[in-house]
Amino acid sequence: MFNFVKKAKQNVLHDLGPLYHKYSFFGVDNDQLPGMYELNQKAKVPVITAYIAYAIAKSKKKTSDNVSFTELFCADGYYAMVASRLGCSISIGIDNDRDKQLKNAESIAQRLNLNNVEFKKEEIAPSSKFASTDIIANVGGLYHVDNPEKILELSYKMANKFLIVQSVVSLARDDEDYYQAPAPGWTWGNRFSRKSFDKMLKKICPKIIDRHFNELEGNDRLEDRGSMYYLIEK
């Protein structure tokens, strides 16, 4: 009986096909999209999950306190679901669904028995009027847009207590004033260097609790390989 239940949990997402993320955090052994996704998730998830857990813990004075969370540019809503599992009372994922990953988010959340997660298909722009929540995660969105500073300002304004940021940076350039839009080889997006992204972020977000850098080993080009992480307190 135990083995049957365990097998059912491992295969609960099987019919959805390969997914953007591996859901092993939830005890599910699903198939993942081929290519860069596995290696890049291994780089990003430990850092971002740790930041989410820290922000939730520091947002509570009593165990009964409610904590709210929003993931901007959420794709399949993975981190909104992680925040729910780690104790957020309400968790929201927002994405324009350009890459057609959001369509699976509600189904995945339901199968994982996460009943306090909601998803919104909307464009994220400087003029957006989203509700503020205790924790905002902008992880993987800033390098996709034409106006990263304005989107970072929006993200910071939305956060009542903590902002979590992750973005791709170029390892091909190292000068502190480097900025290119569109991103090299792309028709959209942008690129900073490590130094220039750090300089830009510190202008908007003064209270950095922790920062981290690693490489996205699933990306071959130096222009796409750097990954910066920040945990910011309001």
Segments predicted by a language model, with ranges:
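A short SAM/SAH-binding and catalytic strip from SAM-dependent methyltransferases
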Residues: 135-146
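A short, conserved alpha-helix within the catalytic core of class I
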Residues: 144-155
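Conserved alpha-helix/loop element of class I SAM-dependent methyltransferases that forms part
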Residues: 39-65
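Class I SAM-dependent methyltransferase SAM/SAH-binding core
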Residues: 78, 82-114
